[in-house]
């Protein structure tokens, strides 16, 4: 999953849940 937030190493609650789940 290529997301700017993940690329920056900063995980948001919504982003992390959407990606992992």
Curated annotation (Swiss-Prot):
The protein's assembly and partners: Homodimer; non-covalently linked.
Keyword field: Disulfide bond, Glycoprotein, Growth factor, Lipid-binding, Metalloenzyme inhibitor, Metalloprotease inhibitor, Protease inhibitor, Secreted, Toxin
Keyword field contains Oxidoreductase: no
Family, similarity comment: Belongs to the NGF-beta family.
Domain of life of the organism encoding this protein: Eukaryota
PTM note: Glycosylated.
Function: Nerve growth factor is important for the development and maintenance of the sympathetic and sensory nervous systems. It stimulates division and differentiation of sympathetic and embryonic sensory neurons as well as basal forebrain cholinergic neurons in the brain. Its relevance in the snake venom is not clear. However, it has been shown to inhibit metalloproteinase-dependent proteolysis of platelet glycoprotein Ib alpha, suggesting a metalloproteinase inhibition to prevent metalloprotease autodigestion and/or protection against prey proteases.
Tissue: Expressed by the venom gland.
Keyword Secreted set for record: yes
Protein name (database record): Venom nerve growth factor Bco12
A cellular-component GO term for this protein: extracellular region
Molecular functions (GO terms): growth factor activity; lipid binding; peptidase inhibitor activity; toxin activity
Cell compartment(s), UniProt: Secreted
